[in-house]
Amino acid sequence: MTNVLFDLISLQDYRSGGGEYVKKVFDELLLCNSINIYGVYDSELLFIDNDFDEFSKQIEMFDIRKMKLSNIINVCKIDILFIGIIQRYNPYDLNNIYCKVICVMHDIGDIEITQNNIHFMYKHTIKNYIKLTIDYWNEKSKYSTKNRVLKQYGNIRQFLGKANVSLYTVSNYSSSSILYFFPELKVKNITVLYPPPKSYIRCDNIDDVTIQNLFSSGKRYLLFVNANRDNKNFNVLNKCIDKVVSNFPNMYIVVTGLNMQVETKNVIALGYVSNSDMENLYQKAWALIYASYTEGFGYPPIESLKYSVPVITSNVCSMPEILSNAVLYFSPFYENDLFFKIVQLHKEYQYYQ
């Protein structure tokens, strides 16, 4: 029997594509009779929905705030430690871990954003403008955003360099990006494994009243997901929304995670959306707009394509590798390019279904 200490921290606090990956690995491991699973979580982070109750019924769990990773490993005689999103472990003590370790680094988007000065394009508070001033005039300063972000990886980089630690990632793009910024890891054989498909069940019953009304009305809509995350780049769509609505007055824009005011009447803003409702949104959309600045893999386009829903996506990072010629591409920096691709899709819709 192999004892595995499984990372539950990557499933806490918020939903993400990386978290979906980790949950799928967990579900598959539960089916293995030759593996005994223990879980590590952080009591200072929230579990999503009823995850804590579900996990505690299935495995024995340890709080990293009460016991160091190394101590959990020794007490439970762990053979393999699995960390599903290695960046989530930056705050913790990673010393004295001698068992086999499997780590996944999905991307280094925060480094890519700052090293390429994309963070200058984000919306900022007055406080953040002070930081941007430092970035603009003295980017080599230890206080610059570039150097502060890189410094946050210090603990992780040291840990990944150990002989007992194996590193996995989710695309060839992510592998090359990791090696570009962390050249010392070239001695590692980074394994690339594309993420498994999601296994959510789509129910015909809709939980959200707004979504119910949307479907009942039969309105056509563009779908944009996770607008609350800066790297998803809702701003580029927001800039051309008026032109989209003006040219296509019967087209609506459905946005999940929207935390800003949009005055265009054809925008439907949604907060939390259940997994089943999200599947229905993907299935019934006229098209998905995926404008990310950075992606290690990118689940949403795959989710849309499985329902034969066209995708208009940014042409950077992993997108061309993962999506090939199945989608329409645009530059995430040009609102006019996005608008042009929406017009093009409208003219040639049958070719992208």
Predicted regions: what is each one?
Residues 1-353:
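Carbohydrate transferase catalytic cores enriched for Leloir-type hexosyltransferases
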